Amino acid sequence: MQTLHALLRDIPAPDAEAMARAQQHIDGLLKPPGSLGRLEALAVQLAGMPGLNGTPQVGEKAMLVMCADHGVWDEGVAVSPKIVTAIQAANMTRGTTGVCVLAAQAGAKVHVIDVGIDAEPIPGVVDMRVARGCGNIAVGPAMSRSQAEALLLEVSRYTCDLAQRGVTLFGVGELGMANTTPAAAMVSVFTGSDAKEVVGIGANLPPSRIDNKVDVVRRAIAINQPNPRDGIDVLSKVGGFDLVGMTGVMLGAARCGLPVLLDGFLSYSAALAACQIAPAVRPYLIPSHFSAEKGARIALAHLSMEPYLHMAMRLGEGSGAALAMPIVEAACAMFHNMGELAASNIVLPEGNANAT
C-alpha cells in the first residue's frame, strides 16, 4: 500500500512534448492564432497531463465535497448553527443543494464525504470521519499531524480509485460552519498577510462581528505558530478536516496526472497547502471562479492564478468548480472538433492573433 511520501514522490511532471504538439495543432485550427484566448491555453495545459494520454479530453466527472465541523465555531465566527453542516450534508445526498444542481447540469457525480461532521453518521455519505469536529484553533491545534497525514493519504487513495474507474476531471468542494476562519488563517500564514487583509464575511457574518473574527485568526496563528514552509503543519495547526480533505483530492489527482478544478476561497487555502507540500501539484490545478470572499485576490496572486469566471459567488460547496466544468469540456471540443486552416484554403498573415 502506497505511503504518503511515495505518493508525493510519484507525482508526474507535465509532458512538455505533448503540450508543444497541442499548441502546434491549435495554431493550425480554423481561426487566427490565439483568438480563442485562454481556452487555447487551457487545452494545452490539459494536453500536458499524463493521465489524459497526451490529448485534452474529459471522461467521467466527479465533485468531491469534504464535510466537517470546526471547534472554532465556539468563538462566534459564524452565524449559522453548527448542525447546519449535517443538515446540508444530508440535503446533498438528496441532490437539492447548489453544488448538486450545478454538478447535475454539468454531468458530474457528487461524492459527499464526511471527514469530521459533529453529528451521527448520515446515510448516503462516504465515511472518512476522523473525529466529530476538529479542535478549536483559537486555543490549540485543529488536529494532530498524524491525523492530517492519514486523512491526506486516505482521500488521495479515494481520488486515485475514482481515476481507475474512469474519472478524468475532478472538482473540489467543502461544507462546514465556520470554515472560512481556518481558511483565512491558512491564507494569512502562507501569504504572510495580516488577518485583516484576508478575513471576510463568510456566510453573511454581520460587519459588527468581523473584528472578532480577525482577532480569532490572529490568536490562532499566535498560539499555534504554524510553519509556512510546512504545508501539513499549517493544515494540522490552523486548518480543518475539510481543508485537509480538499488538499488530499489535489494530491491524489496530481499523482494520477489528472486535472482538478478549484472552487472558491476555501479551496484556494487548500491549494496553497497542496503546493507547499508538493509543488508538482500546481500544473494540475485549474481555477474556476473568483470568489467574492475578501482574501481571494491575495490567495490567487500567491498561487499565480486567474480564474475563468467572475460571478460574485461565495456559496462554496464546489459550486464554482461545477460551473466551470463545461469550460474544460469546451477546450477539449475546440481541440478535437474545429477544422484546420490547411484544409480550408485560408491563408493568414504571420503573427495575426486577432479575430476578423
UniProtKB/Swiss-Prot annotation:
Pathway noted in the entry: Nucleoside biosynthesis; alpha-ribazole biosynthesis; alpha-ribazole from 5,6-dimethylbenzimidazole: step 1/2
Keywords: Cobalamin biosynthesis, Glycosyltransferase, Transferase
The reaction(s) this protein catalyses: 5,6-dimethylbenzimidazole + nicotinate beta-D-ribonucleotide = alpha-ribazole 5'-phosphate + nicotinate + H(+)
GO molecular function, one term: nicotinate-nucleotide-dimethylbenzimidazole phosphoribosyltransferase activity
Residue positions of the active site: E317 (proton acceptor)
One of the GO BP terms on file: cobalamin biosynthetic process
The EC number(s) this enzyme carries: 2.4.2.21
Presence of keyword Coiled coil: no
Domain of life per record: Bacteria
Enzyme class per UniProt: transferase
The UniProt record lists the keyword Transmembrane helix: no
Primary role: Catalyzes the synthesis of alpha-ribazole-5'-phosphate from nicotinate mononucleotide (NAMN) and 5,6-dimethylbenzimidazole (DMB).
Subunit (UniProt): Homodimer.
UniProt family annotation: Belongs to the CobT family.
Listed name of the protein: Nicotinate-nucleotide--dimethylbenzimidazole phosphoribosyltransferase
Species annotation: Salmonella schwarzengrund (strain CVM19633)
Taxonomic lineage: Bacteria, Pseudomonadati, Pseudomonadota, Gammaproteobacteria, Enterobacterales
